[in-house]
Amino acid sequence: MYIRGLKILLWVFITLAVILSAVWLLSFGKIYDKQNLEYGITFSSRQAKNLGLDPKVLFVKILDELKVDKLRLVAYWDEIEPENNNYNWNDLDWQINEAGERDAKIILAIGGRLPRWPECHYPTWTNNLKQEQKNSETLEYIKITIERYKNNKNIIAWQIENEPFLSHFGECPELNKKFLDKEIALARSLDSRPIVVTDSGELSLWVLAARRADIFGTTMYRDTYSKVLQRYIHYPITPAFFQVKKNVVNLFAHPKEWIVIELQAEPWGPKQYQDLSQAERDRTMNLEKLKEMLDFARLAGFQEFYLWGVEYWYWEKVSNNNDGMWEEAKGLFAN
């Protein structure tokens, strides 16, 4: 019995050693020099309005003051088609034209699930449609949007849906993978530019999203608030977590590019951040945390990052006389 017990312990030790060695090896990957990193932002006119800002004024400042030349823009379906077959392209046309005049590169996000709360942005007229009809209308909106903009040379990729495999987050229907595949296939049939599929960095496994992507985009957050736990959370992970995850997923999926599509650069609290005190906002984002986040992201082994929070930086600047993050961003995008 004694010898048998020793053999079991030895096998346990060997197994653990192999697992730990594999994790250690998978945690290695290329880390890019700071001068080779590329930064962009996600812009939401909806979020700017929510903060009481003029979206057009802000957008021009993003282009001309911050010198941002990589953008993720959002084709909100409920704004583009507020009534069935009644389209309003004015806002998105303007954004794309302004970006084009500065030769900025654009990822255009399309779908029912898109950036910013409540995550899904279906027009109200689709609420009472049967699912089959709603799907048909969704495909029609994607088709019309891509056909409208596919001759624009500044659009470099189409993002189809936003974090589709995180359907439990936000006010959204359950994911239908087969329909997601139809959306992606439609986009591919209309234009040859790459397809971006995104997923949560901390809450998803990536494989299903990465398999569908030419460009896979992860989110990256460190400090958030959980309504379920009713407390603030600091994710106890290191940059190596993303290196390991990427290397493991790369065994099963082979996107051509891996990017950080949503890098936390704004607070995440129990309420909208404009309704939080400065001290409360600082718990999850401020200038020092932004600098830490940028260092963390670089060490995670990615080269391209789209920051999430440009509306917040400007709101802090004009509403609270706090221009620290805005000025930090100037230096970031100027490099």
What are the language-model segments listed below?
Residues 1-20:
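N-terminal Sec-pathway targeting helices
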Residues 22-69, 74:
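Boundary/entry segment of secreted carbohydrate-active catalytic domains
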Residues 49-65, 138-148, 199-209, 286-296:
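Short, acidic/polar
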Residues 57-126, 170-197, 211:
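Aromatic-lined substrate-binding rim segments of carbohydrate-active enzymes
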Residues 76-91, 114-135, 164-172, 230, ...:
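Surface-exposed, active-site-proximal loop segments in enzymatic domains
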Residues 113-115, 138-173, 306:
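Active-site groove signature of glycoside hydrolases
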Residues 156, 257-335:
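Substrate-binding cleft of secreted/luminal carbohydrate-active enzymes
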Residues 189-273, 324-328:
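Glycoside hydrolase catalytic-domain groove-lining segments
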